[in-house]
Amino acid sequence: MSKYKRIFTIVIDSLGIGAMNDSEKYGDVNVDTLGHIAESVDTFNIPNLQKMGIANLHPIKHVAPVENPIGYQAKMAEASVGKDTMTGHWEMMGLHITKPFKTFTDTGFPQELLDELTARTGHKIVGNKSASGTEILDELGEHQIATGDMIVYTSADSVLQICGQEETFGLEELYRCCEIARELTLKDEWKVGRIIARPYLGTKKGEFKRTSNRHDYALKPYGRTVLNELKDNNFDVISVGKIKDIFDGEGITEGNKSKSSVHGMEQTLEIMDRDFTGFCFVNLVDFDALWGHRRNPQGYAEELEKFDVNLGKVLEKLHEDDLLIITADHGNDPTYTGTDHTREYVPFLAYSPSMKGHGQLETPKTFATIGATIADNFGLKMPEGTIGESVLNKLV
């Protein structure tokens, strides 16, 4: 019989807790997402994360370590090469990424790809560079509305993003163009992790706003993950936020899209009221998209404080046979240069009301510790070719 009937894993997207040993290879020197956020604000109040021992793992200004944190804490290292969303989440579920996804941050996309995309979609392409979503809209939104040209851009991540004004370009047309882009970028030399449809509203510079009709077209995971094992063995696998997109639906029994990170937590609280057996996997993207990439430590701190209030409600709702894991998929230090993710350790905070003990675990060498622990709990073997060692027997 399973030790825990339900396991909830909440990914605070981009909440790194200090540079990994190899971070300089990734151009990241002395990065520290959580530490630097706390240093950037006058007050920082996260009592529930504090109670779970986050400040025992890592020094945080304004947040003292606690003598008896609830549950268990660890600093997790990433085994895979990369510091992006897909690599982080796929590794959590057991995959070891040894070849990084293609990025076009410095060069833009090859002309040959753009020519094919124009031929197949019927739209001229503008942009073709790395930019933030707000910048590219201010620069080219009015042009798109006037001409019907397609705004294509990238970021430090392995993504090809296409913007479309919902009323003039049209949502269905945007999705059609993205499906064509996904098909074209399955070639090895153009293989990006995700195509992202970026719809927006507004008619002039300074007024453009992205809508919640974003859609991701991810690569399928290259191998079976813990999610497949759970689904194939009739366990519920409920996703919240962009998890379903990240895994291209593989191993998911129910997907819930979120309008924001606060909405994602509200959805999680609703799911906690339901009777199910299995895994609820939650991604809260606003930390990364709104505050990390935009280098806004104050906004990030406020978002964490809002999250912490809802975390308190989650802790109250946990059953004796529930396990909660709080983690992140990479760093994104909002005080660092540029707009890229940062290569950092991430927190592993695990708590169940049935735990008698508490304390710090040794640093796991891979995010796949999470997937291995989940598989172990439900009596499943890790899929062939995956990595990760369970810490289930240490959660007592």
Curated annotation (Swiss-Prot):
GO terms for cellular component: cytosol. It is found in: Cytoplasm. InterPro entries: Alkaline_phosphatase_core_sf (IPR017850), DeoB (IPR010045), Metalloenzyme (IPR006124), Phosphopentomutase_DeoB_cap_sf (IPR024052). Binds 2 manganese ions. It is an enzyme of class 5 (isomerase). It catalyses: 2-deoxy-alpha-D-ribose 1-phosphate = 2-deoxy-D-ribose 5-phosphate; alpha-D-ribose 1-phosphate = D-ribose 5-phosphate. Its cofactor is Mn(2+). Pathway: Carbohydrate degradation; 2-deoxy-D-ribose 1-phosphate degradation; D-glyceraldehyde 3-phosphate and acetaldehyde from 2-deoxy-alpha-D-ribose 1-phosphate: step 1/2. It comes from the Bacteria. Its EC number is 5.4.2.7. PANTHER family: PHOSPHOPENTOMUTASE. Belongs to the phosphopentomutase family. Isomerase that catalyzes the conversion of deoxy-ribose 1-phosphate (dRib-1-P) and ribose 1-phosphate (Rib-1-P) to deoxy-ribose 5-phosphate (dRib-5-P) and ribose 5-phosphate (Rib-5-P), respectively. HAMAP family: Phosphopentomut (MF_00740). This is Phosphopentomutase. It comes from Clostridium perfringens (strain ATCC 13124 / DSM 756 / JCM 1290 / NCIMB 6125 / NCTC 8237 / Type A). The gene is deoB.
